[in-house]
Amino acid sequence: MRDNKVSPKPFFFASPERREVFPAKTKEKITRKESREHLARFNLACELVKVIRHFFPELLSLLKRVEDPRHQSYIIYSNHVLLMTRILSSIFYINSMRSTSGEFNDETVIENIGVLCGEELRELPYWETINNYLKRFSSDELQKVVCRLVYRLIRSRAFEDARLRGKYWQIIIDGTQLYRSRKDLGEHSLFCRKKKGTEEEYTEYYYYVLEAKVVLHEKIQVSILTEFIENEKREVDKQDCEQEGAKRLMERLKEEFPMLQICICGDSLYASEGFFKECRRKKWKYILRYKEGSIPSINQEYQVLKRREKNRVEEPEGVYDYVTGVDYRGESINVIEYESAKEKKKFLL
């Protein structure tokens, strides 16, 4: 184990189908510590297979059903082998496909991946083969697989305790910047002017992506949908933005999970009349981190009402105050203010 990350080769050191735990062809004595480490590697390989087969028994069949863009007469590796190899490289924290070819170039690794894929493999696909395949591969196909796997997790009832009030699944919407460069990243990239009006003015280009993640446990958040924030072309009057991307993401979420009881969680960026109406139209609940200044009228009314209603409660973990039914253009907003005793921080929701 390196830097608290499982090293890929030891993780797949022994096949779960094998009876022997230790190498048969060795004349060297191993220490007790090495014995424990080797046994741990064997157990980890077995546990990975168990997790996949228990929680995601459909994974292999779903990967087999994705549309293959290649000419079927000229392929050597099935699409599910290519995809499974790439998925495993991510699980093992391998940062590049070139490194994957080196790390996975081992008879036992090849055998184990073959077990997962249901095929007898002599070799694994080279990194260039996988990259060329992914360039032609539609990301929408993989998105369908992700949604299906998440749907199974939700239906399994293994994470029922994660529901708010025993009913609503928390879906966190959050944005992440992927790249930033002074070099033009393409016509779809976003851009901003830095040091505007000075001799040092320059343009910075970047990509931004929104993720919708379902909370299954306080330490487990699983991505459901991905939405890129990007311009249709370089010359635009108004650039794409996170709020518009969130609208598209919410529409897709409703299409994929029309009956799911959802509580959307996000930051103050989404606090707007349009967002509130969208949630009401979709029959969703929402919890937003509120910052003073995003909608001043809400904070002003809250400050007046909390002095009048006196709902303040003090507990060892912290102090909280709340006001229900704050009106904002016909929307009834509940505001909660919480101050953690441990962190000495205030939060407005």
Predicted segments, located by residue:
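Short, conserved catalytic/metal-binding motifs centered on acidic residues
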Residues: T85, T100-S101, Y126, I130, ...
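An anionic, glycine-rich sequence signature occurring as long contiguous blocks
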Residues: K285-L349
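Electropositive, glycine- and tryptophan-enriched low-complexity nucleic-acid-binding patches
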Residues: K194-Q261
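Charged, often Cys/His-bearing segments associated with DNA-binding zinc-finger transcription factors
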Residues: M1-P57
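DNA-recognition alpha helix
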Residues: M97-G118
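Domain-level cores of phosphate- or acyl-group-handling catalytic modules
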Residues: V236-I298
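Basic, short loop/linker segments at the boundary and entry of helix-turn-helix/winged-helix-like folds
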Residues: I52-M84, E119, E128-N131
